[in-house]
C-alpha cells in the first residue's frame, strides 16, 4: 500500500528534492498534501506531475490564479490549512518551511 506523503513548502529546495525522491519511488508514495506560497510556475508543474490530493497555497493572488487554472483538476486547490484538518492522517510529513 502506498504511503500518503505531505510536503510543507513543496516549491523550495527541500521540497523540490523531496519531489525527486517521490518521482523515483512512485510505487511507494501517494502525494497527499503539498503546501506552497506563491511560485506560480512550480506550483503548476507540481499539480500536473504529482497530482496531490490537496494543494494549499498561502498567497491569495497565487491561489486565485491557480484555482481558476486548475478548476477541473482532481487536485483540490485550497487557501486555508484549516479546511483539511478533518481529513485522514498522512503517513509521512516533510516540513520544508523556513
Where are these regions (language model features)?
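N-terminal Rossmann-like dinucleotide-binding module
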Residues: 1-51
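Structural motif
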Residues: 8, 34, 58, 78-80, ...
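Residue-identity detector for threonine
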Residues: 11-13, 19, 62, 75, ...
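Glycine-rich nucleotide/cofactor/substrate-binding loop typically near the N-terminus or early
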Residues: 32-39, 43-72, 76
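A structured beta-alpha segment of the ubiquitous adenosine-cofactor-binding alpha/beta core
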Residues: 67-98
Amino acid at each position: 500500500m502506498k504511503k500518503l506523503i505531505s510536503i510543507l513548502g513543496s516549491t523550495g529546495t527541500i521540497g523540490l528534492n523531496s519531489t525527486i525522491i517521490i518521482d523515483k519511488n512512485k510505487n511507494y508514495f501517494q502525494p497527499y498534501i503539498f503546501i506552497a506560497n506563491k511560485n506560480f510556475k512550480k506550483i503548476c508543474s507540481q499539480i500536473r506531475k504529482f497530482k496531490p490530493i490537496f494543494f494549499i497555497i498561502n498567497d491569495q493572488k497565487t491561489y486565485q490564479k491557480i484555482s481558476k487554472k486548475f478548476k477541473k483538476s482532481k487536485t483540490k486547490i485550497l487557501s486555508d490549512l484549516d479546511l483539511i484538518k478533518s481529513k485522514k492522517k498522512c503517513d509521512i510529513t516533510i516540513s520544508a518551511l523556513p
